[in-house]
Amino acid sequence: FGVMTMVWGIVITPLWSAVTDAVSNNDYKWIGDSLKNYLKLFLLVIVGAPIMLLLSQFVYRIWIGDMVQIDINLSFWVMSYNIVVMFSSIFVNILNGAGILKVQTISSLISPTVFLGVAYLLYIMGMGVPSILIAGIIANFNGFLLAPIQCVKLLRNK
């Protein structure tokens, strides 16, 4: 799943500076069109990630042999975490490029507490290693919840 995230990082990197340029030119239509295009591209992730999950046990055997057993449940949560991070990056990059940082700054102060609390709670409930990934997903509430709302507001107000 790291390969998928790495490729996505290469694809998403130009968005931030391109949005900054679009904002300076008052070209909010371009931002809206880019958002739609990135969401369409993200659909490939939604299709590709489950395929990678289905192939993961086979790839693990080739990669590390039988030395370490990686549970499919752990792979599922790694996949889910990466999907959330990639989805979030679309909206966060747009907001960063537009210079809209207040909500992100506040949520970045709250997020570590949410992460630690949820991770600890899930761990004592017996979730094991996946508790870290689940906590990471929940603590990323800015990226998958607040940032999309802010992007919609940004595009509606212009």
Task: List the model feature ranges, each with a label.
Residues 42, 78, 82, 108-109, ...:
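Residue-level recognition of transmembrane alpha-helices
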Residues 1-8, 141:
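Alpha-helical transmembrane segments of polytopic membrane transporters and translocases
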Residues 80-110:
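Membrane-interface junctions at transmembrane-helix termini in multi-pass inner-membrane proteins
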Residues 28, 55-83, 130:
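Interfacial segments at transmembrane-helix termini and the short loops linking adjacent helices
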Residues 5-25, 96-97:
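Helix-loop junctions and terminal segments of transmembrane helices
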Residues 27-43, 51-55, 72-75:
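Interfacial transmembrane-helix starts/ends
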Residues 56, 99-102, 112-145, 149-152, ...:
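Membrane-interface helix-loop junctions in multi-pass transport and translocation proteins
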